[in-house]
Amino acid sequence: LGHQTVIDMERPFVTIPARKIGNKFRAAEAAWILSGDNRVSTIAPYSTKIKDYSDDGEYFAGAYGPPFRDQLPYVLNCLRADSYSRQAVISIWRPRPYSSKDIPCTVSLQFLIRHNRIHTVATMRSSDAWLGWVYDVHNFSCISAFIALHLKGVELGALFLTAGSQHLYEGNTEAAKKVIKCYETEIVYNKELTWKGMKPDD
């Protein structure tokens, strides 16, 4: 409970061979969020099971794209007006959420600029350490990089990801044990994956 992970968003991506990651889905989901989309048809080609979480088969009730799209102008204006503002927050959680198969796991994203670096505080009500965490870290880093590119001259800082409940489902326990066992000897740093040189339209 109340678990926090701190990640340097400037560091190269790290992969472990024992942990198979859907890299196409990871990239597609980040682009899907940044575009403000919530349609099933645009993300389903990259995941065979994701459509099962849609209530009507057409849209996702808890998609992060629409709140990101709608609140991004406020965040950019807020940080441009006062780079030390503590009010640059995107709210993902819905007041009085209705019953749905797609309740958002993330409550909010707060963006803080300190010493010319943008830091992100992600507050999550629930975080699946196996299935969701690796994608959440990537998505929040992409969102932060997107904002930094639009602010110009701002570098990426740290991602503080705090989860009310960070958990591992029983069905993923054995796979997680294998990753922990090989972590020391099979960690791979991919130095080619970096945000450097990107532009807002990339």
Where are these regions (language model features)?
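Terminal, non-catalytic protein-protein interaction segments that mediate quaternary/complex assembly
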Residues: 1-202
